[in-house]
């Protein structure tokens, strides 16, 4: 974000130290190339989905009371809950502002739907947390919303902006959702082990 300075810039510098796989931007480009020809908009889409992902991680760390992420102190551990929530909101707003530069409103629609699903999943998780009687179907439904929505959207957006047919978009979105579910299951297992 080239228009930030001072404290906000310092917070972004700290956030950048967490690294990460940058999987979602890679999915945008991968599926853009698989179903058509990637355009200049795929680079913007990659930045948009990564900003939304980072926003969700900042909020998730606060909700979970996480002290570390990737072996570094979380922003909420360093600055309390207010700063990461506001920084997450800033990333979220900037991501949606960037969607306005794209040739169609498809990204805004897809990402708004994914955002609703993420919030719905977080609410469900808050109510279902630490329940030993949690049924498998409820677990998968919760994470289909919470995690998988933001894995399906990059795949579908990569395809949409490369000119894919609606059926192709549904197929690649389904792949992304399945990938997100698999990642969440592995992540949960690692929390237990």
Q: Predicted segment positions?
A:
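Mg2+-dependent prenyl diphosphate-binding active-site environment of isoprenoid biosynthetic enzymes
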Residues: 2-193
């Amino acid at each position: 974000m080239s228009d930030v300075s001072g404290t906000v810039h310092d917070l972004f510098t700290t956030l950048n130290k967490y690294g990460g796989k940058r999987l979602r931007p890679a999915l945008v480009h991968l599926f853009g190339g698989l179903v058509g020809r990637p355009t200049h908009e795929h680079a913007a889409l990659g930045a948009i989905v990564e900003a939304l992902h980072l926003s969700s991680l900042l909020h998730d760390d606060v909700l979970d009371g996480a002290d570390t992420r990737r072996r570094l102190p979380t922003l909420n551990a360093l600055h309390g809950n207010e700063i990461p929530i506001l920084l997450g909101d800033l990333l979220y707003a900037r991501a949606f502002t960037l969607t306005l530069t794209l040739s169609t409103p498809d990204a805004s629609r897809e990402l708004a739907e994914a955002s609703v699903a993420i919030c719905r999943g977080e609410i469900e998780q808050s109510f279902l947390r630490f329940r030993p009687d949690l049924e498998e179907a409820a677990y998968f439904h919760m994470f289909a919303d919470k995690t998988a929505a933001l894995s399906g959207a990059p795949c579908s957006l990569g395809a949409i902006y490369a000119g894919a047919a609606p059926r192709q978009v549904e197929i690649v979105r389904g792949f992304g959702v399945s990938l997100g579910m698999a990642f969440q299951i592995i992540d949960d297992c690692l929390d237990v082990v």
